[in-house]
Amino acid sequence: TLESLLIAKELLDRHEINRFAVVCLPHLCEQWQNEIKDKFGLDAEIIRSSTISRLEKKLRPDQNVFRDIPYQVISIDYVKQGNKRNIFLDHCPDFVIVDEAHTCAKPTGANKYQQQRYRLLSDLANKPEQQLVLLTATPHSAQSEDFQSLIGLLNPKFETYQHQNS
């Protein structure tokens, strides 16, 4: 957590970015918001179904939360589907931290469109100027296809890489 925020802060200080988003599981939103405030003094807004009405009331009609709120903590389950997903992909910050990225792996045997979280990350990773940090403290499981689906976001060749046992 801290290391990814240090990267964001460094990019902010260098004026290489002027906003960022953390995409995380719903129950981790407050923890991320507190870390951002306590460690860096930045006021991040939590974006999820229970906060969206309040946030939108603060904005002008021509604004949207993903483009016009500089520091965002977003519930992945709020933003993974439908119109919200498309608006996020169109207007999200250039720097996005994805916490618990292992929960976004493509399920073994499934095609990539069967998993909404994976599809969101895949589309995000394919944006040309997107900077993406994937965080996970969960050890690599025996399901190599799941792991390959995540590293395939970094380079599509990795998703089809066949490991040779020696």
Predicted stretch roles:
Residues 102, 124, 128-143:
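Conserved helicase ATPase motor motifs in RecA-like P-loop NTPase domains
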Residues 89, 140, 148-151:
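Alpha4-beta5-alpha5 "output face"
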Residues 27, 142-145:
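Charged, alpha-helix-enriched surfaces in structured cytosolic catalytic cores
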Residues 1-5, 9-127, 158-166:
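SF2 helicase/translocase NTPase motor core
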Residues 147-160:
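A short helix-turn-beta junction within AAA+ P-loop NTPase domains corresponding to the substrate/partner-engaging
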Residues 98, 144-147:
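Conserved AAA+/SF3 P-loop NTPase catalytic/coupling segment centered on the Walker-B
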